[in-house]
């Protein structure tokens, strides 16, 4: 694993030890719940309801694979009453401290690691982990809600978090139904989703779309010329109509695909920018999980030949 920048390993080790000690977290009247990513934060907020401060550590457009924690970030982790993270090495440079805390404390949860391993996809970059991008399947993401509720129940033993879990399930079931409806009309020959890195495998498996990417599950390594050439060959052979950039990943490699295909006489367009490892700007529709996924589903369907409404599921795009 790469060395930490901006904060020493000893500081992270100390943070892991302190995080694993629930007595150090001050149980305020309005507890603070700290989530690493926007997707995890949105899930926690939906289950928790009112009465909690839900904060997110990794900001808009920041790649969690490459996020470098600062001393201020560790301070926020220490002050939080509960910490929720994705797990399966999504938070690459924070993996050790978060895993240590989750193993020893009952107020730290890796939401994706709470799912049965047989439901998850393999991680070729890290054999000890699964593919971390579970939020790309709304039905799988909904299954992360009950483990969140169990952690919250330790903070508020008298509070019933069942309604939040059920509301989350219903909201994500509606999102899933929308995806199935608008993606189904995509012609078989066009059912290929080509993106910068391999964040959409769960999405592809759920909606029967072949997923191809220039990079692997992690964005830590640069795309190789060989990978780009292989993807250009695929575009030409399958006559793929569109490719997609990602909001948290540089678009150089994807634009190289477009130019490479053009040089081979195959026209391929940029189908749009998808939200993969980070949501949109806080306070906007795409700054929510539902809005992020609505945008992705609608954008993919429109570019590949589906039949989405002009402004998406909730008429807010």
Give residue spans per PLM region.
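N-terminal secretory signal peptides
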Residues: 1-7, 11-22
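Extracytoplasmic metal-acquisition and chelation regions
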Residues: 4, 26-317
